[in-house]
A protein has these predicted regions:
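Cytosolic covalent-transfer regions centered on His/Cys nucleophiles
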Residues: 1-144
């Protein structure tokens, strides 16, 4: 099974504040039992306090919390916003990938595949132009 299936990829026309953007991006993982609400709030706390985020490409961040913060199984979700949003005043992003991992190593292969995908600016542009989640999923499946 794919680590990032179509039903965990969202495109929104809304412009929430950054905390709600992380909540929206996390919703598919919460709804499918990969994480609990605590994980989402801890991911928000990390941006607010520790600045422990991973900005992996221009306008693309990975939101995550710790392995002990309410993760039940490994998964990813994806949210594309209509334009870049300021995250706590120190980074701007319009693509949020939420990564949930129950240990410190199992997610690394998927993370490296995601880096490969995002290394090509053309892929990021294609994700920004995509009309629906299926288009984004097709692109991601080539890598992850």
């Amino acid at each position: 099974p794919s680590l990032l299936p179509d039903d965990r990829i969202q495109i929104t026309r809304e412009m929430p504040d950054w905390q709600n953007a992380i909540r929206m991006a996390s919703a598919p993982l919460l709804d499918n039992g990969f994480i609990n609400r605590n994980y989402i709030e801890k991911a928000i706390d990390m941006v607010e306090t520790d600045k422990r985020f991973i900005m992996i490409a221009d306008g693309v961040i990975i939101a995550h919390a710790g392995v002990d913060d309410g993760v039940y199984s490994m998964g990813m979700s994806f949210l594309r916003l209509p334009e870049k949003l300021s995250f706590n005043g120190y980074m701007d992003a319009d693509i949020i990938v939420v990564l949930a991992t129950p240990d410190k190593t199992r997610h690394l292969p998927a993370l490296y595949q995601l880096f490969d995908l995002l290394e090509d600016e053309g892929n990021i542009s294609a994700m920004r132009r995509a009309q629906d989640a299926h288009e984004i999923a097709r692109l991601i499946r080539k890598y992850i």
